[in-house]
């Protein structure tokens, strides 16, 4: 049996005894175990308060966790393990009741070991050398398996990453989410005489709000909650002969502002397109054909960034630039466009696309080889296929369980085609009316006012 005694100084007293060997100060019990009990009492007997300071039950030093069935520091953990493995026997030269602290814990090993046992440390929890080695081998095996799984995960190639980074950068450079340029447009005009058309438009917005509330409480069915059939009935007599010119002017009071907004957005879409990898390699004729045919679809995709499910509106900065359905009706648009537009925005918002997915979808939308007026179908299709491959690879990595996400995104492109057709038809109708076409910008008239030849 190994015996290790504490050193005694020339005065006959150990450093431990000369130090703070008393366990009570001024008659108050302040042991480490008392402090631990106080720190854990708020969370119950079986739950340790993670926010409370962890204190070693042996010496009061900062604890690193439970070791051998007790909360201890690394030093006392090692001391207990060594003592048990060596089957050491220590003798206290004093009364066997030394107070163990961080500073004097090396001075009386007997009382330190006794304290370890008193707080519940058990030698049965100590692993043998063979068990330690098996544990190390198991940890190493798990690390190797994790590394192998990581190596098997699908990864984007450098080229695919470069494409995504280019598109994200292009979007950031051509989409100002502060909407600071909106103050340069002709100002929005929402007020005017309360005519039948304005009243119907207000009802449209009111019912949209009701639909929004229903959607928030029951998001499982967009089609049933966003019921526009009642709204359509309100507009049955919108073109009746007794509609006055004043009524018509009030109904289109937002046309100048929204025409400027769309014209501005078209310019930004052009800037975005020029930064899509491969777009500038196309002929000028194909670039123009693609832009004229897809511009409004890209604008609708981008506008989803400002669309709110709470009130079915587009918030573009201050209150003057918060657009509701009522505002869109005052630019000459009807329910044939607004109903599918709002449903599209809601559905797209619910997909919760990453920014990378959003910009890829815009680029795929723009590079559609079946657009009217396109000449080099093969080349454009190759560019689009490459982007589709990147999108699918990204989805596989970021959404391992989202097998249907890609299909849902492609379906949104089909929805955009229908919206595009109706939007162009309504804008062409406006362009044929001199009193309204004069409010449109030349760029808007060029893109929406005539068919692509």
Curated annotation (Swiss-Prot):
Record carries keyword Phosphoprotein: no
Entry-linked Gene3D superfamilies: Erythroid Transcription Factor GATA-1, subunit A, Retinoid X Receptor
Cellular compartment(s): Nucleus; Cytoplasm
Residues engaged in binding Zn(2+) 1: 56, 59, 73, 76
Short motif 9aaTAD, span: 442-450
UniProt region (Interaction with coactivator LXXLL motif), positions on chain: 274-292
Binding-site residues for Zn(2+) 2, renumbered to this chain: 92, 98, 108, 111
Zinc recorded as keyword: yes
Tissues with expression: Detected in embryo 24 to 48 hours after fertilization and in gastrula.
DNA-binding annotation, residue ranges on this chain: 53-128
Domain remarks: Composed of three domains: a modulating N-terminal domain, a DNA-binding domain and a C-terminal ligand-binding domain. The 9aaTAD motif is a transactivation domain present in a large number of yeast and animal transcription factors.
Protein name: Vitamin D3 receptor A
Species annotation: Danio rerio (Zebrafish)
């Amino acid at each position: 049996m190994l015996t290790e005694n504490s050193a005694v100084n020339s005065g006959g007293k150990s450093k431990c005894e000369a130090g703070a060997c008393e366990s009570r100060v001024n008659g108050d019990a302040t042991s480490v175990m008392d402090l631990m009990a106080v720190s854990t009492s708020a969370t119950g007997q079986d739950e340790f308060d993670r926010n409370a300071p962890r204190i070693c039950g042996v010496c009061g030093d900062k604890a690193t966790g439970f070791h051998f069935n007790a909360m201890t520091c690394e030093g006392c953990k090692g001391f207990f393990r060594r003592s048990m493995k060596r089957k050491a026997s220590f003798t206290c030269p004093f009364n066997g009741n030394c107070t163990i602290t961080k500073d004097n814990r090396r001075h009386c090993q007997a009382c330190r070991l006794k304290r370890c046992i008193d707080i519940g440390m058990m030698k049965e929890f100590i692993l043998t050398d063979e068990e330690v080695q098996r544990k190390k081998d198991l940890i190493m095996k798990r690390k190797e398996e994790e590394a192998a799984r990581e190596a098997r995960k699908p990864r984007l190639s450098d080229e695919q990453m470069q494409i995504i980074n280019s598109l994200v950068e292009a979007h950031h450079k051509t989409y100002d989410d502060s909407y600071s340029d909106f103050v340069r447009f002709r100002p929005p005009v929402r007020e005017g005489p309360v005519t039948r058309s304005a009243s119907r438009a207000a009802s449209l917005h009111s019912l949209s709000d009701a639909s929004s509330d229903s959607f928030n409480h029951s998001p499982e069915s967009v089609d049933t909650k966003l019921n526009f059939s009642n709204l359509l009935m309100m507009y049955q007599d919108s073109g009746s002969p007794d509609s006055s010119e004043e009524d018509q002017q009030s109904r289109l009071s937002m046309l100048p502002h929204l025409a400027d907004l769309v014209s501005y957005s078209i310019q930004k879409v052009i800037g975005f397109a020029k930064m899509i990898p491969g777009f500038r390699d196309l002929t000028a004729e194909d670039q123009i054909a693609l832009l004229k045919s897809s511009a409004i679809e890209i604008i609708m995709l981008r506008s989803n960034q400002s669309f709110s499910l709470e009130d079915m509106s587009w918030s573009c900065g201050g209150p003057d630039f918060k657009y509701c359905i009522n505002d869109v009706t005052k630019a000459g648009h009807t329910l044939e466009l607004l109903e599918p537009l709002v449903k599209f925005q809601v559905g797209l918002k619910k997909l919760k696309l990453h920014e990378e997915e959003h910009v890829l979808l815009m680029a795929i939308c723009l590079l559609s080889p079946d657009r009217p007026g396109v000449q080099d179908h093969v080349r454009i299709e190759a560019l689009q296929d490459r982007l589709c491959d990147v999108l699918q690879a990204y989805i596989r990595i970021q959404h391992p369980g989202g097998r249907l996400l890609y299909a849902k995104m492609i379906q949104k492109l089909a929805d955009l085609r229908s919206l595009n057709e109706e939007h162009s038809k309504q804008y062409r109708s406006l362009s044929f009316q001199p009193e309204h076409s004069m409010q449109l910008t030349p760029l808007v008239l060029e893109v929406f006012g005539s068919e692509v030849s």
